[in-house]
């Protein structure tokens, strides 16, 4: 991590459990990010925390560190059963739950606390087998958690820590009833440590904190601008007819090491994937229609660098931490202003720089004024020469439900294409 992303506060300065500090330092984490430096003094004192911080600033490690410390420092209830986890971490998406689990594994290995994972889509029996052996920390999405609870595979009566991650996204996805169902089955707020983290702390999120937490302390890390000063933003105004050719020309010019392209619909994403795959790019597709095993495989391949480009709907815009994303392309300007911030927040993370390129086409240009008002600044406009756009493009591939979601490997040097300034 860049030093500009960290504070002078060290994890070892806190009265954290020694095993937690050792695990953090083994992973190279010595200094706290701002949200960690604000939250840890409160959680270590047993205070509930509702935290807001910009995407990529260390929210996950803030609540994981607090959770592991609390469980190591407080005994479980005397009559705890094997199907009773001690901590519950709720996430809005399968991908985020899997990611939190991966981030927690080094801490689990160092401390001996057992992790469980519960998410819908697949793996029901495999997940259940782990739960039946007994877990200390259960991470999951609300639907699968409720499913296991209703069938008495898990009992939430011994919960000592509750974490709600990406709370605003929970509302957006309509999970608030599920959250309240789960909260009704854990011990009262005063008998547990509660943490809520979100990129935004809207009125409805604060209302949820008031309902379900014990006099939570609000901590906020607000950047000077919502989009982060390390992200270079750029905007083009293509016609609908030139939009795809402009995207492909920009990709050839930028030749990004690792890029995410966002579009507003799954059908648009499939179309983009088809054009890029036909042109020889190593590209993966991530939409709600992609099967769960394939989604995880595509994310893993993208994270490892086996794929250079990921085309995604906003299902991937929240919570995913994929290191070293150099470019984000907004093929469509999002209808929701917050989604613009979350999309481009995939790059410029953990002190790195990033580049966001947005295409304001005839269909979605009307979204731009609200986005610029929300982020508090105008997005710099760049021009292009229509005559310089790529025009020797192969016929796009068409996705069938049986074919893989990946394109061929990209090989060779980029075409010698340049846009005019």
From Swiss-Prot:
Q: Is RNA-binding included in the keywords of this UniProt record?
A: yes
Query: Residue ranges for motif DEAD box?
Result: 165-168
Q: Where is this motif: Q motif?
A: 9-37
Catalytic activity reads: ATP + H2O = ADP + phosphate + H(+)
Among PROSITE patterns, the record links this protein to: DEAD_ATP_HELICASE, HELICASE_ATP_BIND_1, HELICASE_CTER, Q_MOTIF
Which EC numbers characterise this protein's activity in its record?
3.6.4.13
GO BP annotation list: RNA catabolic process
Q: Which residues form the Helicase C-terminal domain?
A: 245-390
Q: What Gene3D superfamilies does UniProt report for this protein, alphabetically? A: P-loop containing nucleotide triphosphate hydrolases
- HAMAP family hit by this protein: DEAD_helicase_RhlB (MF_00661)
Q: Which family does it belong to?
A: Belongs to the DEAD box helicase family. RhlB subfamily.
- Function according to Swiss-Prot or TrEMBL: DEAD-box RNA helicase involved in RNA degradation. Has RNA-dependent ATPase activity and unwinds double-stranded RNA.
Q: What is this protein called?
A: ATP-dependent RNA helicase RhlB
Species of provenance: Salmonella paratyphi A (strain AKU_12601)
């Amino acid at each position: 991590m860049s030093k500009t992303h960290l504070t002078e506060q060290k994890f070892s300065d806190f009265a954290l459990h020694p095993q937690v500090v050792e695990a953090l330092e083994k992973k190279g984490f010595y200094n706290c990010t701002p949200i960690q430096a604000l939250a840890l003094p409160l959680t270590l004192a047993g205070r509930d925390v509702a935290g807001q911080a910009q995407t990529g600033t260390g929210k996950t490690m803030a609540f994981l560190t607090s959770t592991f410390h609390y469980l190591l420092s407080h005994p479980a209830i005397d009559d705890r059963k094997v199907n009773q986890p001690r901590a519950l971490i709720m996430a809005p998406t399968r991908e985020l739950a899997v990611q939190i689990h991966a981030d927690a594994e080094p801490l689990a290995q160092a401390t001996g606390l057992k992790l469980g994972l519960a998410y819908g889509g697949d793996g029901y029996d495999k997940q259940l087998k782990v739960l039946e052996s007994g877990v200390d920390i259960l991470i999951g999405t609300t639907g699968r958690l409720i499913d296991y609870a209703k069938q008495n595979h898990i009992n939430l009566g011994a919960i000592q820590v509750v974490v709600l991650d990406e709370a605003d996204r929970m509302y957006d996805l309509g999970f608030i009833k599920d959250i309240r169902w789960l909260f009704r089955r854990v011990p009262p707020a005063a008998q547990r440590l509660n943490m809520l983290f979100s990129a935004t702390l809207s009125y409805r999120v604060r209302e949820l904190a008031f309902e379900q937490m014990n006099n939570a302390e609000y901590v906020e890390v607000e950047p000077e601008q919502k989009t982060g000063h390390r992200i270079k933003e750029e905007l083009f105004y293509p016609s609908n007819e030139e939009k795809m050719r402009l995207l492909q020309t920009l990709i050839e010019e930028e030749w990004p090491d690792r890029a995410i392209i966002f579009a507003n619909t799954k059908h648009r994403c499939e179309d983009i994937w088809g054009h890029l795959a036909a042109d020889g790019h190593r590209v993966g597709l991530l939409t709600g229609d992609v099967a769960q095993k394939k989604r995880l495989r595509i994310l893993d391949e993208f994270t490892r660098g086996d794929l250079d480009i990921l085309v995604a709907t906003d299902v991937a815009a929240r919570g995913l931490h994929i290191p070293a994303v150099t470019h984000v392309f907004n093929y469509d300007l999002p209808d929701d202003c917050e989604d613009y911030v979350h999309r481009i927040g995939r790059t410029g993370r953990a002190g790195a720089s990033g580049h966001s390129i947005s295409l304001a086409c005839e269909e979605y240009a009307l979204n731009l004024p609200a986005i610029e008002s929300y982020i508090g600044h105008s997005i710099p406009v760049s021009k292009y020469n229509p005559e310089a756009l790529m025009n020797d493009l192969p016929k796009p591939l068409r996705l069938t439900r049986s074919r893989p979601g990946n394109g061929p490997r990209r090989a060779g040097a980029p075409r010698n294409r340049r846009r005019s300034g």
